[in-house]
Design a protein with these regions (language model features):
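N-terminal leader/targeting segments and the immediate start of mature chains
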Residues: 16-67, 80
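Gly/Pro-enriched, hydrophobic low-complexity segments
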Residues: 72-74, 127-187
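Extended beta-sheet lipid-handling architectures
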Residues: 42-45, 57, 88-90, 167-172, ...
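Short acidic, glycine-rich loop/turn motifs
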Residues: 45-53, 75-77, 97-101, 143-147, ...
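An acidic-aromatic
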Residues: 61, 65-119, 174-177
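Short, exposed beta-strand/loop patches in secreted or surface proteins that constitute
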Residues: 33-35, 60-66, 86-88, 126-134, ...
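Flexible, processing/modification-adjacent segments and terminal tails
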Residues: 36, 47, 95-150
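Sec-dependent bacterial lipoprotein signal peptides
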Residues: 1-16
């Protein structure tokens, strides 16, 4: 299980190294506006979910719709489950599979399925509270707070040239997953 220290270090980066915090916040809000105006995005997400004593890694091809808040996905890797497709609704509790269903251990105190993580990302980018925005010299890092009270997820997203390239998702001070993002496109 990941310790709380990485969150504190990331926050130190956000607070300490950005020479123009206003510019970083403007970049975060410009990304949100572009995403919402486009109506959605597509991306590949390589997810490493932390289950405490072990991790699982899988890759999804994703399509997030800002209007409905739903995410369509197709498993790209590992090959043994490649091709499984489904939809994650906005409540993250309803996952509809096209044919074969996946069963994975839940994250965030048994409240979040790993295949729902990209939906959390899309929802955060499109409308969650932007708590911090800063720079670590090569990337703009934005911290979103997704949810309320006991159900709040912290979503850190690293942007390069205006597109998300990595995200980490935290619940109650504990890392739940890291997500490498590629092939990001607005549609």
């Amino acid at each position: 299980m990941f310790a709380v220290l990485p969150v504190l270090l990331a926050l130190a980066v956000l607070l300490g190294s950005c020479t123009a915090p206003t510019a970083c916040m403007e970049e975060a809000t410009a990304f949100r506006a572009a995403l919402c105006n486009a109506g959605g995005c597509s991306f590949q997400a390589e997810i490493t979910a932390d289950h405490g004593d072990y991790t699982t890694t899988f890759t999804l091809q994703c399509r997030y719709d800002t209007q409905s808040g739903a995410l369509d996905f197709t498993v790209a890797a590992p090959e043994s489950i490649s091709g499984i497709a489904g939809t994650v609704d906005t409540d993250r509790k309803t996952i509809t599979f096209a044919a074969t269903a996946l069963e994975t251990p839940l994250l965030a105190a048994e409240k979040l399925a790993p295949v729902a993580l990209p939906q959390v990302l899309g929802e955060s980018w499109a409308g969650s509270y932007i708590a911090q925005a800063g720079s670590d010299h090569a990337y703009t890092v934005v911290l979103y707070q997704n949810g309320y009270e006991d159900d709040t997820l912290q979503v850190e997203t690293w942007f390069s040239e205006g597109a998300p390239v990595y995200a980490s998702i935290w619940y109650d001070g504990v890392s739940q997953a890291g997500v490498k993002l590629s092939d990001f496109q607005l549609y």
